[in-house]
Swiss-Prot record:
Organism: Schizosaccharomyces pombe (strain 972 / ATCC 24843)
Record Pfam families: RNase_P_pop3 (PF08228)
Record protein name field: Ribonucleases P/MRP protein subunit pop3
UniProt family annotation: Belongs to the POP3 family.
Biased composition (Basic and acidic residues): 185-201
Coiled coil (UniProt feature): none
Subunit structure as annotated in this protein's UniProt entry: Component of nuclear RNase P and RNase MRP complexes.
Reported function: Required for processing of 5.8S rRNA (short form) at site A3 and for 5'- and 3'-processing of pre-tRNA.
Length: 201
């Protein structure tokens, strides 16, 4: 008696890799946890103290600060670090790596970008006496900076190399992702990405 064969269906998906996109900095879970704990411990608990502590709190406020850093870098003090309290794939913050990279290009100092995830937001917002806190920017003359500096200095700041005076040509790559699915079981396996095809002018 012949053994029943399982049919495997393969699907090919093409993914465009934009060479001009800026990736989120890589921050390990242990560092994220330490930074979240440090913020909960040392953040002020009143609105007046937030202003006195050289902090900018709230996603819209941090957005506006970084935009001013790009537009008028000489007159606006760039933050030393920006903490994002949303998950990286949230549409609310997908622009943040690019925005910080732009501010780093135009500014005289460098700003780190640290994603802490949405799970850290509740405790941090509670400490600040707020209902939510999507982002926090910390100046290097803030009282908090001395507690954060050693933890964030090894995190690479976002940079847009293509904004430099002599940018290198970056090819656009299309990666081929092959997935396989057993038709009789409905289970799906992700295959490895194949080397991308390069499209040049």
């Amino acid at each position: 008696m012949k053994k029943k064969q399982t049919k495997v269906k393969q699907t090919v998906k093409l993914v465009l890799r934009n060479p001009l996109s800026i990736s989120w900095p890589i921050v390990d879970a242990n560092t994220q946890e330490k930074l979240a704990q440090t913020l909960v411990q040392w953040l002020p608990a009143s609105h007046k103290d937030i202003l006195d502590s050289k902090l900018t709190v709230g996603l819209n406020s941090v957005n506006e600060l970084l935009e001013r850093c790009c537009q008028n870098a000489k007159d606006v003090t760039q933050p030393a670090v920006v903490f994002i309290l949303h998950d990286q794939d949230s549409m609310l913050v997908t622009h943040m790596p690019q925005l910080v990279a732009n501010a780093n290009f135009y500014g005289s100092s460098k700003c780190r970008l640290v994603p802490l995830g949405f799970s850290a937001q509740a405790l941090i917002a509670k400490k600040l006496g707020l209902s939510r806190a999507g982002a926090i920017a910390v100046q290097d003359d803030s009282p908090l900076w001395k507690y954060l500096k050693d933890l964030v200095m090894n995190i690479e700041e976002p940079q847009a190399r293509w904004l430099s005076e002599n940018p290198e040509y970056e090819v656009t790559k299309v990666e081929k992702i092959i997935t396989s699915q057993k038709e009789n079981q409905g289970t799906k396996k992700e295959g490895k990405n194949e080397k991308g095809n390069e499209f040049k002018k």
